[in-house]
Structures are given as C-alpha cells and as structure tokens.
C-alpha cells in the first residue's frame, strides 16, 4: 500500500506472527514467501527492527519526509487554507507543498459543508523548527477564528498520513 509506514507495519506484523511460533528446537519454523532482497524481508530474516528503523530514517531524511523533518497538514476549503497560510509567519526553511488530496480514509474537517471541496497543504520544516511551526499555526488558527469569516480548517502537526 502507498503509505510511509507500510514497511514498518509489515515488519511489525510479521515479527508479531513469528513470535507466536514455537521454538526452533521444538520444530517451529517461520517461512516468508517473498523476494529475499526486499529490505523489510531482510530485516525479518535478521530479526533486526532497529536496523530497519535506522534504514527507514536515513531514506526519509534523504527525501525530506517525517520523522527526519516536522510536517503539518492543513485541511479545509482552498480559500480557508490559503487564508491561514497568508496569516502565519512560517519559520525559516519552511517548505509549503501541495495542494494534495486527503489520504484515503481521512475525514473532512468538522463543519465543512459536504459540497465544498477539501484540499490539503503540507508545511515541512527542519526538526529544530517544529515548536515554532506549531506555535505559528496555533496563533494563525486563533486569528482566523476570531475573525469568524472563513470556513473551518484542521491543522495536524506530524500526522500519521500525509497524503
């Protein structure tokens, strides 16, 4: 599946299932029917979740994906998302990405009319600016809420699914 955590979830499930098998001395066997060169399969064969996590982190750092960076997802009507981004002073080094579709299974922001298309913008910052990003977005949401003239927006810092 297309998800940043797909390999992590697969390894966790496989290791959980393998842990239920009786000991090798008692005749227990775990079989993996998959291409042995796949890194996740290698991690299972070596029983190395730490090595797998280190490799995943390095790969994500190379392309600027969490958890090597902090990321905020801003969901809502295009005008409301734009209004929030216009209001916020983003930290140095911030990248605004999108719009992207909402990930499958993610609900629309509460209060968004069903006929209004929902968009998602992503804001990516270096790890050291995560608190600054969260504070700026909190302030921006507060300002827009006080104005009461925009559609609702949902802000998630470091969401599990980014789009």
Give the ranges of each region predicted by the language model.
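Accessory helical-bundle/CTD segments and flexible terminal tails appended to RecA-like ATPase motors
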Residues: 1-9, 16-163
């Amino acid at each position: 599946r297309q998800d940043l955590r797909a390999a992590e979830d697969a390894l966790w499930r496989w290791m959980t299932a393998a842990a239920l098998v009786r000991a090798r001395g008692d005749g227990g066997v775990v079989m993996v029917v998959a291409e042995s060169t796949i890194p996740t399969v290698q991690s299972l064969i070596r029983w190395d979740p730490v090595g797998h996590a280190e490799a995943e982190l390095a790969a994500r750092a190379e392309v600027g994906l969490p958890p090597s960076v902090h990321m905020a997802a801003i969901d809502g009507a295009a005008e409301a998302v734009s209004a929030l981004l216009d209001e916020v002073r983003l930290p140095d080094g911030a990248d605004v990405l999108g719009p992207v579709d909402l990930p499958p299974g993610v609900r629309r922001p509460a209060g968004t009319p069903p006929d209004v298309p929902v968009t998602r913008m992503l804001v990516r910052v270096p790890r050291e600016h995560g608190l600054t990003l969260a504070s700026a977005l909190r302030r921006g949401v507060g300002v827009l809420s006080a104005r009461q003239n925009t559609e609702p927006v949902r802000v998630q810092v470091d969401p599990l699914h980014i789009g």
